Amino acid sequence: MDLKFATFSSEIELPFYSALFSSKLDHDKLDSSARPVLGLYEPRSQANPEASTRMQILGSALTSDQDESGPLGMTRAEGYIKNVNTIEEFKNTDKNAMIKKAGEQIWDAIQDGTIYSCPSLLASFRILSYADLKKYRFTYWFAFPALHSEPQWKRTEPIGRLNSDESTALVERIGTWRYMVDRREHGFFLAKKVRGEASGPRSSLDDPGVDIGYRWDIGSLRDFETGFFNDAAEEDRYVAFVDPSNYPEYPSWPLRNLLILVRQRYRLNKVQILCYRDTQPRRHEARSIILPLAMDQVGDVELKSMPKVTGWERNGNGDLRPRVANLAEYMDPTRLADQAVDLNLKLMKWRLAPNLDLDTIKNTKCLLLGAGTLGSYVSRNLLGWGVRKITFIDYGSVSFSNPVRQPLFKFEDCHNGGKPKAIQAAEALREIYPGVDVEGYALSVPMLDHPIHNEAKTKAEFDKLKELIDSHDAIFLLMDTRESRWLPTLMGKAANKIVMNAALGFDTYVVMRHGAKPLDDSEDTLGCYFCNDVVVAADSMKDQTLDQQCTVTRPGVAAIASALLVELLTSILQHPLKQHAPAPISAGTGSAVSYERDPHDHPLGLVPHQVRGFLSNFQNMIIRGKSYPQCSACSKPVLDAYREGGWDFVKTALASRDYVAELSGLAEVQRLAEKAAAEMQWSEDEEGMGEEEGEGELI
């Protein structure tokens, strides 16, 4: 009777798709070369025949060690997956050449005997796949290469079976043997009945009164060539394999390759195949079958060339076509969003910026002081870079003029006096991306030249501001007034944080990073927002007309400045010195000015100190400014006084801006300037008198 085989069907765990997604995105990138993947199969005693013979691909299949064999009772299969870059490449891959190459690996291992070290190659497989990382659709096609026997093997006698006692003894003996051999040998082995001896030691679970009249002996495939069967009668010799098939008469696919080995290595044209279908928990069921096989006589048993190879899997409709898994149908939407947020960023590492450190950016905790126009755009750009922790501080409410310029707010947010900006901005970010860790605090920042009306409340606001600055990595100054930025500038410098600042004019903007505390004892560092001031910041809203009180700018200025500010932050984070990175120094002059990357392999380019933009002529200038020894916010005397006095210093400074001017040295600078101006005026007066006398003499 002709022999028929039950083909393998693929069965992929959902976590495997996620692992393949991550592997492609984070490691393989454009590399589409084949990589190992572990397959597993097992006898399923309770499964319908159609549900048996499954090649299982677990979630850990890509990372499993070569010595692993998966859960207890499962047999390993050696596989490779080729995950190509485009669907066109998938379609154009030569499928015949691919399966032929897989068959050659099996054939060569049989020919040179290396199959004995890795019998699991007889159950090998290949996967051709394409992962659409944007749509979470995986197109894949399994191949289970099988070498065809010619002439075919046929069953010569009825199928044999073991009784319950024989099966139990066999299962026990195989279990003992497996502890002594490599896991790759577990699926294929030799078995013989040794008669004339006691059945040998039994498990405590066996019935001690049962004697089957022989004992089982198990050997590896290689043992055939060293005389394993020499002392056994022909009817007591079995070549065995783990058979996941539940069909009463049809063995599973791996037997095809095993029969080639039997012919090519053992030179046999007649053999008893033990299809091992029993498991330890159900060893009394005796499900294994014995196939007496023979093939027609041939002149030479040894094959001279590799036989025909087949084995591409049919899809659910029975067609020779690939399968498609739409992972989006099974994934939690929040998890989908998580992976989608990182997708474009990780694609940067494929070609354009392979050294980009995305984790550093992602894990940077950002504090945004101001949730208005700048705060809205900055937060959206931070989300685009994958930042997961964002905190807003703002004391204002959403007004009807805000939604058209501030993209985090809607018309409904303006009703009933307006929702608190910081709270609503946080809620809006959460709606955009649920995975962001965002908070909002309706908090007033203490400001210079603004009197303290409630000291307890102002101190509580100061304490909360200090707590938030200390717990974040990057501080963004995005408020409307100059004086509101003074205290956060001072606190950020004292805490050695990354401080980012953006300010707008009608058609101009400045984007800058504040200088950090020097790494050495020098005082040479980059300046802050206040280092160009010759007076201490005061109440800028007092006695101002409406157009001076509102931020009147061209609508695109805020978006441009915000984008540059976030890009500057990411460049800082990619520099090995972070906030201590030096500013680039220009080479050349005029239109020929240029800058060099420092370091030269910085993935994003320059890390400037300031970028000043002019929308009237669409130009940017890169500026490098040193810290000012008499700066009202970052000079050493002011920093030392703040570190020593804390709230007491801040309370004094808020009560009298002259105190800050005297402490920093700005007051003395002004006195010297006034004195110099007076002396210059006196000198000009003297020069004028001399000229008049001369003119008189000429006349």
UniProtKB/Swiss-Prot annotation:
Organism listed in the record: Sordaria macrospora (strain ATCC MYA-333 / DSM 997 / K(L3346) / K-hell)
GO molecular function: Atg12 activating enzyme activity; Atg8 activating enzyme activity
Gene that encodes the chain: ATG7
Localisation: Cytoplasm; Preautophagosomal structure
GO annotation terms (biological process): autophagosome assembly; autophagy of mitochondrion; cellular response to nitrogen starvation; piecemeal microautophagy of the nucleus; protein modification by small protein conjugation; protein transport
Domain of life of the native organism: Eukaryota
Pfam families to which the protein is assigned, alphabetical: ATG7_N, ThiF
Oligomer status and interactors: Homodimer. Interacts with ATG8 through a thioester bond between Cys-550 and the C-terminal Gly of ATG8 and with ATG12 through a thioester bond between Cys-550 and the C-terminal Gly of ATG12. Also interacts with ATG3.
Entry's family note: Belongs to the ATG7 family.
InterPro entries reported for this sequence: Atg7 (IPR006285), Atg7_N (IPR032197), Atg7_N_1 (IPR042522), Atg7_N_2 (IPR042523), ThiF/MoeB/HesA (IPR045886), ThiF_NAD_FAD-bd (IPR000594), Ubiquitin-activating_enz (IPR035985)
Motif GXGXXG motif boundaries: 370-375
Keywords on record: Autophagy, Cytoplasm, Protein transport, Transport
Record's comment describing the protein's domains: The C-terminal residues 653 to 691 are required for homodimerization, as well as the interactions with ATG3, ATG8 and ATG12; and the C-terminal 17 residues are required for the ATG8 lipidation. The GxGxxG motif is important for the function, possibly through binding with ATP.
Active-site residue list: C550
Protein name in the entry: Ubiquitin-like modifier-activating enzyme ATG7
PANTHER family found in the cross-reference section: UBIQUITIN-ACTIVATING ENZYME E1, UBIQUITIN-LIKE MODIFIER-ACTIVATING ENZYME ATG7
The UniProt record lists the keyword Hydrolase: no
Region Homodimerization, annotated ranges: 653-691
GO cellular component: phagophore assembly site
Described purpose of this protein according to its UniProt entry: E1-like activating enzyme involved in the 2 ubiquitin-like systems required for cytoplasm to vacuole transport (Cvt) and autophagy. Activates ATG12 for its conjugation with ATG5 and ATG8 for its conjugation with phosphatidylethanolamine. Both systems are needed for the ATG8 association to Cvt vesicles and autophagosomes membranes. Autophagy is essential for maintenance of amino acid levels and protein synthesis under nitrogen starvation.
Disruption phenotype: Leads to lethality. Heterokaryotic delta-ATG7/ATG7 strains and RNAi mutants produce aberrant fruiting-bodies.
